């Protein structure tokens, strides 16, 4: 530090750049402090010196009014170099804006970043309030938990009892208190977010409420009568979102995969519960209480395993068993709360390699993609049935696993060969067993005669109308139906994707084409080799392909593999069937048979559930399907097959190039091209370019290349007027012929040429050599010369004209011309006089 030569000086520094955007006060403040002066951040009465440069007019006026010494930055520098207090009158400050009118007050804005001050409760009032609010909330929670909290409990006989005292282990709150204490000590600016609490619960399981023990008897937890289907969560007690709670449960369960039962480490404890509630009595005595405890959101939109809302369509795509997921992670217990009454659901792990699945129908929850007005009733009733513990329903040889859960489903190993037999044994919920829709589609358990009678009972009146999702068996409660064995032992399976209630007939037609008949109709085929499908109205616009959303995950691959083969066979076989309809009418019923039996390789058979061969049959209930639909169906499918193979539509052959255009206009052009179609955007002019759009009439390389190739050189207004008209309008009135006279001439020559267009501008000129140091680049300049009919040599000794600066030995017989000669000649569409473009020798 220098000697305190300015110890009596109290300075106020205001030094700005001349344009008022940069504040340089800090540099001079440091120098003044080093010399012993005091620097004030505000202009107060103690200030004796003002270091001023291009500052505020108000500061200047205030300094003059108070008689404070106004000095320039040179005074500070002179004091520093001289090491003494220099006379202030030698370096007076200047105010350049003093005599200018101050009508427009320019706002000063410093572009330098501000110093970052770390927020603590001491220097930030908002953080202090938040800190105090958290502390008060913690104190209130501790007070309410330490006191006597009366609660209502269900006794084993189903009656309500009043428990005067219940104390819950407050490990969660002690963790919060510990966190606040750490914040007080360290003065951290972090609040305990949910992610931190989740991490804390993973590190120390005893500090998480989800692992806080609640004394429900081990017999209730491990018995076969334990319930699994009430999708409530700990949100009412814990305060966490469903997502955080599910993540915490998942983390806890993965750590305990080695143990046979992870329930024992996750038992929630209460001090004064004398007997475990009987879930059978809850089902019998108080079903209304269970209904009231299930929220509407929970009924209609159940959560999946990571806490997000699962819509019915998403459940269809991912609708395989919960057991698959929970077997994988060794069964994390499912927690439920019904107004203070806590339930823990658990299932014992099966000892066998294959999972044992419940084969009675009432345990399988229906899929919610059936009728929407029944969605609430259908989603509640199976959950109530899950609470039943009657002994007559327990027919399990070993430790039985509970039924599937619609809300917490996964399809991790649904296609595993171990699960094929288990999926065959799955039955359907009793609600869906209606007279018009036979519920069981197991072809092995029904004779051919029985299947024929069931088929005759089926109602085909809905064919051709606006289709609803069929009530039959809730589409076997799976997106992919279980493989059905036929009489001859040949395995057949079908995709049963479901369309929404509002799907129109054309959309369903296309779905039927691409997904091998996704709309299952009621009844089984009399031949017993698959299911019956409906082919809807084939009058479908061809541009409808992009409206379909494929299924998720593994189902997407299966759908594409089966759907593509199905569409190909459907077109060909339908045509054959239509041509031979007269011959076959005496032997068979008149029907449009579309056989989708496709040979698969051994590897594909394994991937597609042991061989995906489906039979799609259509009953002749609509004569428009019979009369002329086969040929139109074939024509309809062809473009979709091509789109399926290529993955996207065919690109336009014409390209459009933009030049001298700001990004805002470029974005508008791109949007208009996307809307009106017919063009693709290219960065540079190429063989396919037909239009060059110029935002300003500047001679750019793209404009010159567009002229040389005979393209339209248009103004930006052409795009705007085309957008106004809704289609591409005529280009003549928007051509930039005034600025580029050669453009319309070359364009007409291009239109009149039979083959690929090549100009004749430089056809009569001798061989040229383009210098490597030329500007524009050599490649572009050579391309321009070549497009205009000129000949370009790679070596200078063969050329009679050298374009661009040339540093080698010059010959008297060779013309050394500037690059502008080529550019001006192309622009004017005539060879300019070379004398005006000669380079100095």
From Swiss-Prot:
Protein name (Swiss-Prot/TrEMBL): Microcephalin
Localization of this protein: Cytoplasm, Cytoskeleton, Microtubule organizing center, Centrosome
One GO cellular component term noted in the UniProt record for this chain: centrosome
Biased composition (Basic residues): 342-358
Annotated positions of the Phosphoserine modification: 278, 286, 295, 332
One Pfam family per UniProt: PTCB-BRCT
Cross-referenced SMART domains: BRCT
Domain remark from Swiss-Prot or TrEMBL: BRCT domain 1 is required to prevent abnormal chromosome condensation. It binds directly to the SWI-SNF chromatin remodeling complex.
Main localization category: cytoplasm
Chain positions with Phosphothreonine modification: 334
Quaternary data: Interacts with CDC27 and maybe other components of the APC/C complex. Interacts with histone variant H2AX under DNA damage conditions.
BRCT domain residues: 1-93, 646-736, 757-839
Region (Disordered): 340-375, 417-445, 481-507, 562-593
PROSITE patterns in the record: BRCT (PS50172)
UniProt keyword annotations, A-Z: Cytoplasm, Cytoskeleton, Phosphoprotein, Repeat
InterPro entries found in the cross-reference section: BRCT_dom, BRCT_dom_sf, Microcephalin-like, Microcephalin_mammal
GO biological process, one term: mitotic cell cycle
Keyword Oxidoreductase: no
Organism from which the protein derives: Colobus guereza
SUPFAM superfamilies according to UniProt: BRCT domain (SSF52113)
Superkingdom of origin: Eukaryota
Segments of skewed composition (Polar residues): 433-445, 565-583
Function: Implicated in chromosome condensation and DNA damage induced cellular responses. May play a role in neurogenesis and regulation of the size of the cerebral cortex.
